[in-house]
Amino acid sequence: MPWIQIKLNATNENAEQIGDMLMEETGALSVTFLDAQDTPVFEPLPGETRLWGDTDILALYDAETDTGVVLAQIKASNMFPADFAHKVEQIEDKDWEREWMDNFHPMKFGERLWICPSWRDIPEPDAVNVMLDPGLAFGTGTHPTTALCLEWLEGLDLTGKTVIDFGCGSGILAIAAIKLGAAKVVGIDIDPQALLASKDNAQRNGVAEQLEVFLPQDQPEGLLADVVVANILAGPLRDLSGIIKGLVKPNGVLAMSGVLDTQAEDVATYYRDELHIDPIIEQQEWCRISGRKQG
């Protein structure tokens, strides 16, 4: 059946309050926040809703809703000026799940690594295949930062190596490292849900025994690895540089992403004292910083 959508605009200071009002007082079935200015947004911290300064709000109602009544309720809330801008439109029903699934295809990284949704055929059965379904919270290979890290891992000889995935999220990098030959991988993340997702995805890929996951405060003392990958954000990469460098064995290698091109040189300066930094690699305004720790 068709739906009715009402589009409003708000600032980040009152967007969540407006969303609550639309759900509780006007009977909206769902409320979605969108960036009105296409500003990049990064993964929020646990429990945080990241909004933009100029936020579009989309409220969805069933087709029988009296939009005049809804607009009167919005006006009566005193959250908008009397002549507030809005747009009402009819949305045709679709098989949203099928449409969502159709958007995801197997992706190849480097010469031999594939990330494949479970509902798709594996293009190269003899290649290194990681089965991972797209989710809402954690990396699945579609973002340039994840792609940069996957390509870096694929280019290494990981046979028998130990690897740390710092900020493991879905576990995509950790699982790829195991499938590429790593003997043992440790995933670290501040979000317990990420640790659960990593273990679940490792189980589905048959590599759960080779993956250990920890919250930062629970990781073993003296933890070191031949290879460390950290796909997080520029701020934590700066703030935690001492910790991250301390995880890399002498002559070990480190790769970091989640860094915009305007941030890369600054982040790299935090690591040059202990690592020889490679040329910075850029993809769609995102960068990968890698290097080898001095022996």
From Swiss-Prot:
So what does this one do? Methylates ribosomal protein L11.
Keywords of the record: Cytoplasm, Methyltransferase, S-adenosyl-L-methionine, Transferase
Q: Which GO terms describe its cellular component?
A: cytosol
Q: Does the keyword Transport apply?
A: no
Q: Some GO term, biological process aspect, for this entry: which one?
A: methylation
Enumerate the residues binding S-adenosyl-L-methionine. Answer: T146, G167, D189, N231
List localization entries: Cytoplasm
The record's Pfam families line, in alphabetical order, gives:
PrmA
* EC numbers on record: 2.1.1.-
Task: Report the sequence similarity comment from the record.
Answer: Belongs to the methyltransferase superfamily. PrmA family.
Recall the GO molecular function terms of this protein's record: protein-lysine N-methyltransferase activity
Concerning SUPFAM superfamilies, the annotation shows: S-adenosyl-L-methionine-dependent methyltransferases
Catalytic activity field: L-lysyl-[protein] + 3 S-adenosyl-L-methionine = N(6),N(6),N(6)-trimethyl-L-lysyl-[protein] + 3 S-adenosyl-L-homocysteine + 3 H(+)
**Name of protein:** Ribosomal protein L11 methyltransferase
InterPro entries, alphabetized: Ribosomal_L11_MeTrfase_PrmA, Ribosomal_PrmA_MeTrfase, SAM-dependent_MTases_sf
Source organism of the structure = Vibrio atlanticus (strain LGP32)
> Which EC class does it fall in?
transferase
PANTHER family per record: ELECTRON TRANSFER FLAVOPROTEIN BETA SUBUNIT LYSINE METHYLTRANSFERASE
